[in-house]
Amino acid sequence: NEGHKARMASVIFHAFNQIKETGLVKLFKSHRPDFKDGEQLRDFIYVKDLVNVIGWMMHEMFASNWTPAKNGLYNLGTGKARSFYDLAANTFIAQGLKPNIEFIDMPLDIRDKYQYFTEANMAKLRATGYDKPFSTLEEGVQDYVANYLVPAKGY
């Protein structure tokens, strides 16, 4: 449950609650001509995939398959950036609803600093031997909404 995170909760969590309360999701307009509204891109990764990677790394360490050359920081994502629009639309779809998205101005204090594109380079992780696929955005949203948000599971 992400309720305790307030503003720092995931986009899906906020979208789900906006849909429940208002029937729509608000996303930032783009303030750059090379990105359409809602098409700002992030490399969204499902937390279950992160847990799988960490579990695999620990298994490799205990099995003595981990070498010092593999030590270091890893940038984890899926290696495929997706839009905030896709994330919001799939939050509706996971509930059997038609997407209803409104675009609002980005606050001035973040407008000039906002990152329009982030995507993890997965080469380092793949070079360690991790070859499992990651959940698609659609799969991750569907699972999270259906199994955690709709039943309002709290932990």
What does each model-identified segment do?
Residues 19-155:
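C-terminal substrate-binding subdomain of Rossmann-fold SDR/epimerase-dehydratase oxidoreductases
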Residues 1-11, 35:
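Flexible, glycine-rich beta-alpha linker
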